[in-house]
């Protein structure tokens, strides 16, 4: 199977998001890369489902809480930017202060 670099990046991101989901389910707090991966995957899947950029910007702020991540992680992530594929093309989605 031949994949483009972008497709490989997406697969890596989704793999990290799956690991993060499993760790959350076990009651573990997420670290920086796991938190970014989980929120990014949420945005990409929402775009695929046809949600609007505005709704994903808002919903992306409610994927994780401070209690679900390790100390200091919320301050390390002032915003997350994801180029997601919507039904009408690719768009950049920015979520400010994603962990509240």
Swiss-Prot record:
It catalyses: urea + 2 H2O + H(+) = hydrogencarbonate + 2 NH4(+). It is found in: Cytoplasm. Coiled coil: none annotated. Gene3D superfamilies: Urease, gamma-like subunit. Its main location: cytoplasm. The apoenzyme can be activated in vitro in the presence of nickel ions and carbon dioxide, which promotes carbamylation of 'Lys-217' of the UreC (alpha) subunit. GO terms for cellular component: cytoplasm. One of its GO terms (biological process) is urea catabolic process. The keyword Zinc does not apply. Pathway: Nitrogen metabolism; urea degradation; CO(2) and NH(3) from urea (urease route): step 1/1. Signal peptide: none annotated. Its EC number is 3.5.1.5. Keywords: Cytoplasm, Hydrolase. InterPro entries: Urease_gamma, Urease_gamma/gamma-beta_su, Urease_gamma_sf, Urease_subunit. Heterotrimer of UreA (gamma), UreB (beta) and UreC (alpha) subunits. Three heterotrimers associate to form the active enzyme. The apoenzyme interacts with an accessory complex composed of UreD, UreF and UreG, which is required for the assembly of the nickel containing metallocenter of UreC. The UreE protein may also play a direct role as a metallochaperone in nickel transfer to the urease apoprotein. This is Urease subunit gamma. The lineage of its organism: Bacteria, Pseudomonadati, Pseudomonadota, Gammaproteobacteria, Enterobacterales. The gene is ureA.
